[in-house]
């Protein structure tokens, strides 16, 4: 069923992660296990093809196999789902979007071309062609802080005005001023921010998160999302301490964020996975995983307890 915006795309959405077999290829059985775990945890939706899914390392054949398996198991569990069809090259995006729409997802996530930056006119032109390839399937624009073209709120307002099929955006969020600038969009499209900022983001007007905290514990992330007021903000403070203790040191030594996401899943032990990444990336170490679990026990014991509840 197509997703139409804030009413359909809100709360905690969780990503599939690539468990690797002995040949360093994605183990498709892990998709079934992870989606089942997300359904048990009460996640609001699931998605594939984000950075944490290592889409930038997948061959086109792997992308198709993963997307098809994911769509089938998400449908089996009755979870709303989106398929990420990101590609660093514009024509590559069109090919992946054309395939993704055949799987009838609620929406397709796309990124902007990433070799050189685009101006606003170029972004609109690109998104218009993507919309044609999607053939009526709603679109979610994934515009992370590390993208070559990071869009300002005023740009997003213009793009949404020009593209009726745009129903959501995944972005880095911002301060109160950023949310004020985003106000014209907040009733029109779903705005998702980083998972560890969930409580403050929701308070300021965001609709939810494609959650990195669900990598540590899907049930923990959902439980936090259902809290309100001071309780939710207090937990967010402890999440910030956890991130500073466990994740920032990994980022500071050059590990990418998606390596941290996978290491968090290994530490959370809600799914069987190692921190190893697909070629050519180097993942976190087993020592990193142990340190993440230790930090979670210290700062977020309820996240680890939720795994076994």
Annotate the PLM regions.
Residues 129-135, 144-254:
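Catalytic alpha/beta core domains of metabolic enzymes, predominantly
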Residues 2-149, 158:
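Active-site beta->alpha loop and helix N-cap motifs at the rims of alpha/beta catalytic domains
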Residues 63, 67, 93, 127, ...:
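A general structural signal for well-ordered alpha-helical segments in protein cores
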Residues 8-17, 41-43, 205-207, 217-309:
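C-terminal alpha-helical cap/extension of soluble enzyme domains
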Residues 21-24, 59, 155, 262, ...:
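Solvent-exposed, flexible loop/coil residues
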